[in-house]
């Protein structure tokens, strides 16, 4: 993605965020209205108007997200994040847990690589001690494996 695409994506995301915040706020207002519903014709008409406005806002947000020129079409959101949101959890928790899992995996892989290098060097040393005539071949293998014998 070049800088122009990133700027367009940022603009599209900001616009979608504003629209979504407006929809959420309207639904909160609608929930309060339903809770305090007095049952009059005027209040019924107000709720219907608010509901129609929300449906129209959702329709516009959907059109904006599916616009061929919109960068939002290229956004992929992991299903796990959506599940977190549906469960009422903060999606930042998913991000933090994901990063921690990757960090643990990287540490594990790094430890395995270190252990294998130590095993390689130990084997090379023992082979060199037992079979001195194989030292050049062992050194060649270590060099081809892009390793070094650190003591």
From Swiss-Prot:
Keywords: Activator, Nucleus, Transcription, Transcription regulation. One of its GO terms (cellular component) is core mediator complex. InterPro entries: Mediator_Med10. The keyword Transcription regulation applies. One of its GO terms (molecular function) is transcription coregulator activity. Its main location: nucleus. It is found in: Nucleus. GO terms for biological process: negative regulation of transcription by RNA polymerase II; positive regulation of transcription elongation by RNA polymerase II; positive regulation of transcription initiation by RNA polymerase II; RNA polymerase II preinitiation complex assembly. Component of the Mediator complex, a coactivator involved in the regulated transcription of nearly all RNA polymerase II-dependent genes. Mediator functions as a bridge to convey information from gene-specific regulatory proteins to the basal RNA polymerase II transcription machinery. Mediator is recruited to promoters by direct interactions with regulatory proteins and serves as a scaffold for the assembly of a functional preinitiation complex with RNA polymerase II and the general transcription factors. Component of the Mediator complex. Belongs to the Mediator complex subunit 10 family. PANTHER family: MEDIATOR OF RNA POLYMERASE II TRANSCRIPTION SUBUNIT 10. This is Mediator of RNA polymerase II transcription subunit 10. It comes from Eremothecium gossypii (strain ATCC 10895 / CBS 109.51 / FGSC 9923 / NRRL Y-1056) (Yeast).
